[in-house]
């Protein structure tokens, strides 16, 4: 009989313990990018997170000998399940000590929750939507994490290998892209200039008022994401409420010279057909925010990274081109615009977001930059 006790998160005190367990487990870790506490509260609150329009969830804590030793979220994304005809419960935000009993108890709680809701399989690690961290790190444990992904210790996948019935569902890869010290790679320059001339595509210099004002470039960016990511593993279409939420929560932090859009001027409204969003790495700044709090001193480190670019690293949060424009070389326009910006701020390399290992077209974009595939993540599945 297991000595691990599973408790459902039932109140604010439990939720605080759920959120803070990650900070405690990874305190002092040089690679983890801990999320802000306020963002975590928003994510897990049913009355704040717009994903609860089509998701339901429960959160579980694991205790051993009276001590908190693990946590996990059980999530059902009904929108995804219906779109992909896949009745699955997701497990996410999995953290635990190096103990197989704890893992069995945590995933057992998610499995039981899924069965009670009529689900036929368990998949993960996944969040509520594609905007949440995805996959368990299986390679690259000595590499700097990003705010858009999650970090885990090397023993996590080793424990997963001991879990009966769990097999690979999908692998992601991540790349380190080295910024050219000077000049533009000839391939990007040639293709970008040809594409602008031949297809009448343009990359405007955006103002902040255009993102939040009547022109609604923030909404246009997320419309492109909905269309571009529609076929990807784990993705569900963003609702209007989600788009409103993401624009208000995140776009205020973006520097306008690192928010890149491509427009087709052959269309009456200059339709946005491609997007690229980068942000200075906040990992080191977030590590200095004690237990994810901006106050009393954490805010300065975040502002220093965002406004003064006091980091060598830039995170490539999002790159998307509408399918009908990919063969036209539109992606080269993004780098044509962004590489000089990276050089101006002194960034030495960029960290890509997760990419499906089978997505050779996305990975082909990096061929003309010095690059290194330095991380790998896995999502698992098990029939219930």
What are these regions (language model features)?
Residues 1-31:
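Generic start-of-chain signal for non-secretory N-termini
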Residues 2-4, 150-232:
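Acyltransferase donor/substrate-recognition loop-hinge adjacent to the catalytic core
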Residues 15, 78-81, 130-132, 182-183, ...:
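Flexible loop/turn segments at secondary-structure boundaries
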Residues 22-60, 64, 72-82, 208, ...:
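A conserved beta-strand-loop-helix scaffold within acyl/acetyltransferase catalytic domains
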Residues 83-165, 290-368:
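Acyl-donor binding region in acyl/amide transferases
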Residues 123, 176, 261, 277, ...:
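Short beta-strand segments
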Residues 368-379:
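A structural motif corresponding to the C-terminal lobe/cap of the Radical SAM core domain
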């Amino acid at each position: 009989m297991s000595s691990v006790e599973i408790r459902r998160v039932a109140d604010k005190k439990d939720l605080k313990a759920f959120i803070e367990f990650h900070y405690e487990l990874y305190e002092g870790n040089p690679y983890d990018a801990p999320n802000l506490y306020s963002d975590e509260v928003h994510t897990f609150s049913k009355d704040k997170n717009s994903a609860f329009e089509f998701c339901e969830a429960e959160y579980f804590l694991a205790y051993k000998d009276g001590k908190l030793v693990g946590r996990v979220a059980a999530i059902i994304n009904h929108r995804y399940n219906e779109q992909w005809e896949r009745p699955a419960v997701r497990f996410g935000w999995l953290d635990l000590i190096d103990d197989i009993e704890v893992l069995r108890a945590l995933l057992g709680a998610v499995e039981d929750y899924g069965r009670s809701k009529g689900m036929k399989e368990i998949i993960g690690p996944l969040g509520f939507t594609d905007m949440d961290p995805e996959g368990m790190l299986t390679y690259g444990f000595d590499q700097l994490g990003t705010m858009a992904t999650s970090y885990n210790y090397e023993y996590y996948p080793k424990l997963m290998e001991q879990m009966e019935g769990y097999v690979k569902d999908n692998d992601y890869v991540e790349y380190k892209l080295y910024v050219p010290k000077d000049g533009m790679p000839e391939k990007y320059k040639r293709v970008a200039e040809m594409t602008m001339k031949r297809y009448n595509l343009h990359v405007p210099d955006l103002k902040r008022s255009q993102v939040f004002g009547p022109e609604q470039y923030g909404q246009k960016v997320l419309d492109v994401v909905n269309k571009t990511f529609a076929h990807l593993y784990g993705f569900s279409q963003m609702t209007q409420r989600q788009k409103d939420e993401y624009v208000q929560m995140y776009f205020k932090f973006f520097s306008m010279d690192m928010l890149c859009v491509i427009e087709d001027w052959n269309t009456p409204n200059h339709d946005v057909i491609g997007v690229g969003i980068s942000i200075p790495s906040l990992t080191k700044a977030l590590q200095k925010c004690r237990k994810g709090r901006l106050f009393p001193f954490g805010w300065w480190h975040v502002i220093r990274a965002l406004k003064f670019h006091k980091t060598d690293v830039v995170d490539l949060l999002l790159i998307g081109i509408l399918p009908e424009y990919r063969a036209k070389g539109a992606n080269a326009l993004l780098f044509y615009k962004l590489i000089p910006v990276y050089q101006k701020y002194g960034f030495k390399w960029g960290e890509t977001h997760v990419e499906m290992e089978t997505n050779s077209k996305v990975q082909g974009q990096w061929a003309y930059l010095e690059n290194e595939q330095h991380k790998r993540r896995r999502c698992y599945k098990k029939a219930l």
